[in-house]
């Protein structure tokens, strides 16, 4: 299998105004990503999404009140991945877009923000293919049916991001019956990957999604058993400073 390492910058590196960023004691994220990539084995294909997002920094690519990227930001990340893979991305206009209402996320919660603060809006773009199904392992270990994009309009205002893959489930399998070949991949991710995977579903007959924070399997076994062709490691750059997460990931790839 071919291994791809995909690093997503955070909003600090993309949308923070330059005059504010100058006062932040932090290495520029594009340089940090290059430094990380330089330490990887030569066989690993690297994909930095820094430039893809920086080109659209004036657009609504990150939430204001949350640490995640928006569905539109994830779309630009998907375009960057397609360029690396040599496949044609769908145009944004090809997707059906739905809005699920106001959203306030982790930044708001962490700062006990003013109730009058301008809220985010959570929107999602549905896959172009019309024969996509999803199953995932819930917290009790049971395999249940789910949706790649779930209607989160009735969820609590802080839970709207659960629209993507129905949240952070340990193990998810997505099937696209419109694709007749045997193309498959595994996505090893944290929550930033949730908004990105729906775009990838149009290009693979099977996608296995692993949230390494909760999964306890061995990646090598899964790749061999399912005859997986591509492995995508998808992380936001701040994950690298979390020794617990690095340790969890290390356990699964050994």
Language-model region placement:
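Extracellular glycan-modifying ectodomains
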Residues: 1-254
